[in-house]
């Protein structure tokens, strides 16, 4: 096996300048300074001269690169590692990795045919780098820090061997929060310093009033990723949750637009290394999903036709709730912003205004194809200077509003007309070449221009191609990747193992626990008799979680019969639907088992047909457990994991004490329950009262508006649903407390 690139790196230190690292690329020495021969000229050209600004160097380089090389740089898609870390998704399709000489890269081509994002054929890694000149890929695997650094170094070495050197920008979804690893959402858990879910981070910030939680979180991400050579994150979600049935609630910071904006005021400079764009020691962020994905029509996900619309049913909701965090992204110069798949619905929306006080034209195009929002609002009015990175799959399956265009036209329309700079979910240079060729080959002399479109907007042009590539090159120059793309695997392992970072993350886990109810039950005492059981979406998962829970309870007497227990300790982890899988009805938020619910038709309206929903296996047993414990004066202590805003009534009614967490470690929850850590967390979103406040009528209209956060929904709900305090939406417990945003008890 050949020597890994990591073992062959040579470094040249400039006095008062960047380190130059290379394996084989020529290094130019001039006037006591070192320069890398990026463009292959062998001179200190504008491209090679690190003393010029990143923008100046990028502008010079687009004049050197060939058209084919530039087309390869407007696409990004998932990429795989070598045989040591095979992709489970690709393995299910029969793909068998073939190692390169280093053992790190996969040289076997692959056909992706079962993806919701669309089908595509992907070449070997060498062909992707050398022939296609693709320079943006998305990494989903979860290697060790050392292996990650080795893999990234090997990719960078391949890019060095091309005539024109452009380093590889390897992107990843977030890797520093706990939770089930979900394709396309978070790409690792437990490898890097691991915080609770983003909702839990928000709960901790609210409860402690300490925004420095975000500062430390961001700094940890920056140091860990940078040490590994991972320089770009598809993170974080600036979306404000306004419909609780949105599956992606679990990746947000909740429903408080002011807090979300404040979080991004700290998150972006902390990760990128400053507020003036990414630094060589920083990691670029892609803030998503402009102009806010929370305004879901009855929670439907835009990966599917029923969820293709953003509905703004209340006047001014776009500006008031959904835009604020993106202002922070622009203030602090986030390197890129990702528009959402969905498109605005004028027919079902109230008037919305732009930043000049003028009505916004809610043209029915997906936001990546929507010039009004991207070029008009985001760039011209809000002043965004970075690049636009589309969400995954907009050219294939999620092409809402432009489905009448063919794929080359969608590429041209996104890049040339609306201003997208990087198209995600596609590595297909042939489609890009076709879109470019149509600008000059007379294609539309023999083919009809689709109605409502102009032919010049449907093709890639030199102007739009240069603009897009110049923006992504500028980011790479800012990151210092042209000069020093290689990471030190040993240092990567040391940085990720920093004890203080893991301890800080563990503390935030404890701070994320929210105490909702306590009839003098908590904290529990040592030595009490405890019946402990965990409940999940499957019997297998519940059994494994119960075993792990009982092993954590060393200070109590465990009993197997609830009737013999002083305390029943129930850890409840519901799950509704599955990400990237459409549900036959509305996303179920009741904690239930075999519940009969309505189906929906293709337009999202309820039908007379029904199906069964289970969000918690064993939910129907919980009242019996509680009854057995209560029969002799015992108490029930329950904890609910809340990646979604569950309807918690069925659990609260039988519980004497109730806590919630947000992908919070069970050990942290037990610290609160047993008094080892006093509860401080506050709810980052409102928990709905029940099905009645999420009811959808025959026309598909929800009784609580889809575009308004839970804390503000009461103003728009029928008076007949409101109680003596004028409240209708939030759950109210036996003690009279409303489980609204910002609620949380202490002992």
Q: Can you name each region flagged by the protein language model?
A:
Residues 172, 237-248, 489:
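Short, conserved phosphate-binding/catalytic loop or strand-edge motifs used
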Residues 166, 383-386, 420, 629-636, ...:
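A short helix->loop->beta-strand "cap" motif at the edges of active sites that frequently abuts
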Residues 154-164, 255-467, 471:
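Second-shell residues forming the walls of enzyme active-site clefts
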Residues 1-203, 212-215, 221, 226, ...:
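N-terminal hydrophobic targeting/anchoring segments and the immediately downstream early-domain regions
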Residues 1-32, 38, 92-122, 208, ...:
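C-terminal non-catalytic regions of proteins with extracellular/luminal or membrane-system context
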Residues 75-77, 135-139, 168-174, 232-235, ...:
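Hydrophobic faces of well-ordered beta-strands that scaffold small-molecule active sites
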Residues 463-514:
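Helix-enriched interaction subdomains in cytosolic or periplasmic regions
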Residues 137-142, 187-212, 244-263, 300-320, ...:
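Glycine-rich tight-turn/loop motif centered on a GG-T
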């Amino acid at each position: 096996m050949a020597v890994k690139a990591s073992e062959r790196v040579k470094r040249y230190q400039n006095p008062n300048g960047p380190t130059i690292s290379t394996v084989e690329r020529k290094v130019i020495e001039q006037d006591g300074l070192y320069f890398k021969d990026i463009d292959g000229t062998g001179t200190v050209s504008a491209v090679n001269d690190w003393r010029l600004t990143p923008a100046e160097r990028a502008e010079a380089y687009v004049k050197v690169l060939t058209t084919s090389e530039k087309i390869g740089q407007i696409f990004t898609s998932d990429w795989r590692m070598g045989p040591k870390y095979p992709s489970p998704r690709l393995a299910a399709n029969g793909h068998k990795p073939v190692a390169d000489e280093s053992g790190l890269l996969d040289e076997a081509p692959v056909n992706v045919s079962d993806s919701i994002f669309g089908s595509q054929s992907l070449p070997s890694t060498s062909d992707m780098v050398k022939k296609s000149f693709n320079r943006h890929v998305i990494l989903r695997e979860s290697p060790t820090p050392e292996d990650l650094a080795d893999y990234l170094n090997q990719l960078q070495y391949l890019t060095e061997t091309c005539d024109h050197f452009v380093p590889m920008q390897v992107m990843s979804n977030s890797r520093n929060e706990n939770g089930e690893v979900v394709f396309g959402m978070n790409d690792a858990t437990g490898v890097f310093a691991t915080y609770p879910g983003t909702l839990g981070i928000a709960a901790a910030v609210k409860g402690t009033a300490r925004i420095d939680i975000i500062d430390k979180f961001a700094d940890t991400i920056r140091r860990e990723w940078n040490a590994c050579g991972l320089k770009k994150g598809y993170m974080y979600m600036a979306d404000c949750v306004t419909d609780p049935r949105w599956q992606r609630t679990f990746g947000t910071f909740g429903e408080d637009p002011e807090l979300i904006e404040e979080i991004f005021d700290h998150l972006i400079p902390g990760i990128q290394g400053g507020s003036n764009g990414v630094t060589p020691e920083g990691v670029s962020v892609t803030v998503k999903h402009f102009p806010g994905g929370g305004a879901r029509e009855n929670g439907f996900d835009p990966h599917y036709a029923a969820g293709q619309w953003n509905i703004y049913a209340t006047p001014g909701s776009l500006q008031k709730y959904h835009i604020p965090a993106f202002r922070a992204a622009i203030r602090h110069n986030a390197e890129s912003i990702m528009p959402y798949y969905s498109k605005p619905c004028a027919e079902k929306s109230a008037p919305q205004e732009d930043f000049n006080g003028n009505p916004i034209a809610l043209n029915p195009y997906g936001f990546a194809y929507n010039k009004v929002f991207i070029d008009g609002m985001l760039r011209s009015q809000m002043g965004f200077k970075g690049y636009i990175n589309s969400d995954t799959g907009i050219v294939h399956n999620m092409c809402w509003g432009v489905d009448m265009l063919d794929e080359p036209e969608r590429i041209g329309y996104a890049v040339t007309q609306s201003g997208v700079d990087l198209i995600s979910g596609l590595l297909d240079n042939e489609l890009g070449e076709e879109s470019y060729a149509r600008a000059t080959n007379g294609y539309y002399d023999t083919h009809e221009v689709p109605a409502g479109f102009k032919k010049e907007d449907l093709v890639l042009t030199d102007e739009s191609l240069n603009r897009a590539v110049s923006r992504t090159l500028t980011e790479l120059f800012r990151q210092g990747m042209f000069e020093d793309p290689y990471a030190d695997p040993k240092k990567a392992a040391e940085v990720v193992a920093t004890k203080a970072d893991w301890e800080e993350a563990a503390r935030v886990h404890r701070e994320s626990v929210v105490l909702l109810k306590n009839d003098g039950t908590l904290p529990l005492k040592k030595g009490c008799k405890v019946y402990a059981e965990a409940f999940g979406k499957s019997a297998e998962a519940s059994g494994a979680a119960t075993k792990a829970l009982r092993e954590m309870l060393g200070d109590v007497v465990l009993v197997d019969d609830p009737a013999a227990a002083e305390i029943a300790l129930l850890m409840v982890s519901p799950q509704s639907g599955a990400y990237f899988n459409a549900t036959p009805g509305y996303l179920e938020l009741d904690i239930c088992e075999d519940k009969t619910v309505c189906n929906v038709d293709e337009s999202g309206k309820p039908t007379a047909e029904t199906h069964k929903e289970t969000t918690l296996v064993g939910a129907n047993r919980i009242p019996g457990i509680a009854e057995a414990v209560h029969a002799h004066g015992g108490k029930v202590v329950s904890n609910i994991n809340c990646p979604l805003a569950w309807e918690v009534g069925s659990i609260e009614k039988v519980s004497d004490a109730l806590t919630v967490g947000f992908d919070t470690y069970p050990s942290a929850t037990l610290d609160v329950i047993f008094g080892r850590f006093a509860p401080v967390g506050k709810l980052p979103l409102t928990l709905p009262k029940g099905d009645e406040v999420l009811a959808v009528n025959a026309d598909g209209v929800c009784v609580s508006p889809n575009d308004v956060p839970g804390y503000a929904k009461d103003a728009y709900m029928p008076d007949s649903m409101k109680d003596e305090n004028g409240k209708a939406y939030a759950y109210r417990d036996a003690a009279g407390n409303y489980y609204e945003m910002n609620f949380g008890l202490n002992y």
